[in-house]
Amino acid sequence: MLNAPVMEANDAVSGSMAECYVTIDGNRYNMMQLYSFESSAKVNSQDVKILGRTGIGKKPTGWSGSWKGTAHFNQSVFRRWFLTYCKTGKMTPFEIQVSNEDPSSSAGRQTISHTGCLIDSSILAKFDAGDSLLDEELSGTFDGWDMPEEFTELSGME
C-alpha cells in the first residue's frame, strides 16, 4: 500500500466553476442565481424472503430522483412556472442541466441532465428588513437523467 497511487490535490473539482441551465417550455435559462445544488437518485427495493436463509434479500424495483438547491432571491422563472399551474392546472415538467468543470483539475468535465423535473414548493414573496441578502431554498423531483459528459478517470484509478 505504500506505493499505491494517490490523487493530486489539484484534481479535486471546485464547485464554483459549475454551470446550471433550466429549460422550461422550450425556454433555456442560465440559473446563475443558484449557488448550491445537489441531486441524488435512490434505489427502491423490496424484501425477498428466501427459504433456507435467515437473512432477507433485496430486489431492486425502481428508483426515484430528488434535487435541492439554494438561490439568490432575484428571479421569477419558477414562480411564473408555478403561477401557470395555479391558474390553468397544467404543470409542465422541466429540465435541469448541471456541468462541473475545473480548469485546474485533470478530471475534465461532467454534465448531468435531469428530466421530468418538478418543484415541491415555491416561495412567492419574501423580505427581511435587516441587512442580510435574500435567498430561497428550492427542492423537487426528477424522473429521468442522462450523463452526456463524464469526468476523465484520474491517473492511478485503474
PLM segments and residue spans:
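Intrinsically disordered, low-complexity terminal/linker regions enriched in Pro/Ser/Gly
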Residues: 1-5, 149-158
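Solvent-exposed edge beta-strands and adjacent loop segments
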Residues: 2-79, 112, 116-139, 146-147
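Short, acidic/charged, Gly/Pro-enriched secondary-structure junctions
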Residues: 82-113
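Short intrinsically disordered coil segments
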Residues: 83-89, 133-135, 153-158
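Short, surface-exposed polybasic-and-hydrophobic patches located at secondary-structure transitions
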Residues: 141-144, 158
